[in-house]
Amino acid sequence: MLMRTATPLDQPRAIGSARVSSKRVNGGSGIDGLRQSGALKLLFPTSRDIVQATLINTAGGVTGGDRFDIDGCAGAGSRLTITTQAAERAYGAQIGQTGEIKTNLKAEAGSRLFWLPQETILYKDAAIDRQLGVDLSTGAEFLMVEPVLFGRRAMGEDVSTLAFRDRIDIRRDGAPIYLDAIHLQGDVATHLDRPAIADGARAMASLVWVSAEAEGRIDALRRIIGRSGGVSMLHPDVLVMRLLAADGYILRRSLIPVLDLITDDTLPQSWRL
């Protein structure tokens, strides 16, 4: 029998999907629908008022050829928070292979949906394509944060070469209220060192808060972040923030007080570990 040499395409790839929805139940919130398969799992800490779903990637990270799909829906009048058990790690990929993460979220009228994943750590030669689509109904409250680390500075990790494409599309009743795209490729470290881009920072976070309360808290949020970022109102109820930091530890030092203020100290416990 002839033996064939393995190629990069022969390597096993991680595929996973997770879907969760919430509904109003007896004055609180409960799980309405749940599906999970492959390398994505969901855990639910006990809570009557909020459905808190914790995503777990059993593959241990994302690399070229992996595919993950996440769907979340907060039904009318319910509260749903989706977070991750730990930081997601994007490892080096084979040439021509890209890992894909697609997330679709929906918040119906009178609901509250928080999308609070922990950091995504990009390692040398990572190749990641992420898409986040959000569909809001009038009267829905929404919060998202997306922290990203370019290597870990304390470990001396190099991010001189990687490919990172990230797109966020938030719409309300079908009309766009926030569109953002990041595309970094090649010698990312040199790009990040430029004063007009990141001025040497190796950690960043994007935050969007859609709430009638947002404008009233903008001054308090500015005091928390100081000169580490910027915060402004895109619309009377749409607040956006961008943070930069030298590393992940410093980023968290600013980000957790921000999230505590916005969530009224209901930040998932996994963020405290």
Swiss-Prot record:
The record's HAMAP family line, in alphabetical order, gives: UreD
**Record's keyword terms, sorted:** Chaperone, Cytoplasm, Nickel insertion
Q: What does this protein do?
A: Required for maturation of urease via the functional incorporation of the urease nickel metallocenter.
PANTHER family listed in its UniProt record: UREASE ACCESSORY PROTEIN D (PTHR33643:SF1)
What is any Pfam family matched here?
UreD
Keyword Cytoplasm appears in the UniProt entry: yes
- The UniProt annotation puts the region (Disordered) at 1-29
Report which gene this protein is encoded by. ureD
Which molecular function term from Gene Ontology is one that the record holds? nickel cation binding
Where does the UniProt annotation locate this protein?
Cytoplasm
**Superkingdom of origin:** Bacteria
User: What binding partners and quaternary form does the record give?
Assistant: UreD, UreF and UreG form a complex that acts as a GTP-hydrolysis-dependent molecular chaperone, activating the urease apoprotein by helping to assemble the nickel containing metallocenter of UreC. The UreE protein probably delivers the nickel.
The protein depicted here goes by the name Urease accessory protein UreD
> Would the keyword Chaperone be found if you checked this record's keyword annotation?
yes
InterPro entries xref list = UreD
Protein family (similarity comment): Belongs to the UreD family.
**What GO CC annotations are associated with the protein?**
cytoplasm
